[in-house]
Design a protein with these regions (language model features):
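Extended terminal
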Residues: 1-13, 37-39, 173-259
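Hydrophobic membrane-insertion alpha-helices, especially the h-region
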Residues: 8-27
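Alpha-helical transmembrane signal-anchor/signal-peptide segments
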Residues: 29-51
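N-terminal beta-strand/beta-hairpin edge segment
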Residues: 44-136
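Residue-level recognition of well-ordered beta-strand positions that form the cores
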Residues: 59-61, 74, 90, 144-146, ...
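Amphipathic hydrophobic-ligand
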Residues: 65-73, 94-102, 129-148, 177-184, ...
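Transmembrane beta-strands of outer-membrane beta-barrel proteins
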Residues: 87, 160-162, 221
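Non-cytosolic head/periplasmic domains of membrane-anchored proteins
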Residues: 99-180
Length: 259
């Protein structure tokens, strides 16, 4: 009996030791080791990895030869009780786009998600990714995207809600400068259809706009603008090329197509 009891206790202590050793090893597993043995993704490069897979950082993340800067992460263990694997992240330092951001990203039974995520960059840098415009334009101000919640879908998102803000918005052109004031747009996603609606108003110009993008990559936009009392005269002289405004003084535009 004593020998049997000793054997049982020995197996029990061995099992406890193995469990604690495995947990300790997992908790202290270096992120660089995990990255080295992870599946390689073409076009993705991660440099300067430090810390563990639970709390660590990378000095730079590059995707398709664009540097998105550093990233820091901190695993949220409390979310495990909700069936989620979630990270608190900060990103963007030293990025090519002067991008900055922070928030929460994770994975649940419904797929990948993001919440309370904020990302911002100068409007001037945003213009680098806009198709060529016939008239030279320099944008000023800061563009900020706030994602309240976003749930992964195919090809875009199953559900989501956020706000796109252009603060200190303005544009400098050879014909003069425009002050847009704050430009605010509400952005939603429902069943992989993305929609945005926004407006702005200053003494120079007033406008509203709507845009949508469907799962089959078809887009539709509509917008109008109305010159204000202090609209630059040089620009006023060029409005004749846009045709006549409606009876409210608004110039209307609509576009649709496929990406």
């Amino acid at each position: 009996m004593k020998r049997g009891s000793s054997l049982k206790y020995g197996l029990l202590f061995s099992a406890i030791f193995i469990v604690f050793f495995s947990v300790s090893l997992l908790l202290h597993l270096p992120a660089s080791f995990a990255l080295k043995h992870a599946l390689k993704v073409r076009g993705l490069q991660i440099d300067g990895v430090q810390g563990s897979i639970w709390q660590g950082s990378a000095s730079n993340i590059a995707w398709q030869r664009v540097n998105y800067g550093s990233v820091q992460w901190d695993f949220q263990f409390s979310q495990l009780f909700k069936g989620k694997a979630e990270l608190a992240v900060r990103f963007g330092r030293d990025s090519d786009m002067n991008l900055r951001g922070k928030g929460y990203v994770g994975y649940s039974m419904n797929g990948a998600y993001a919440q309370n995520l904020v990302a911002s960059l100068p409007a001037e840098d945003v213009m680098k990714y806009v198709p060529n415009i016939p008239v030279p334009i320099t944008a000023v101000g800061q563009v900020e995207l706030t994602i309240k919640h976003l749930q992964q879908g195919q090809p875009w998102c199953q559900a989501g809600e956020g706000t796109l803000t252009w603060s200190g918005a303005g544009a400098d052109t050879p014909l003069g400068s425009l002050d847009f004031g704050p430009v605010i747009a509400d952005v939603t996603c429902q069943d992989n259809t993305i929609a945005a609606k926004g407006a702005q108003k200053t003494v120079q110009v007033e406008s509203e706009f709507e845009a949508s993008l469907t799962p089959n990559r078809r887009y539709a936009t509509s917008a109008w603008f109305k010159p204000g009392a202090e609209f630059p005269q040089a620009m006023q002289n060029q409005l004749r090329w846009l045709g006549k405004p409606d009876n409210q003084g608004k110039y209307q535009f609509t576009y649709q197509g496929r990406l």
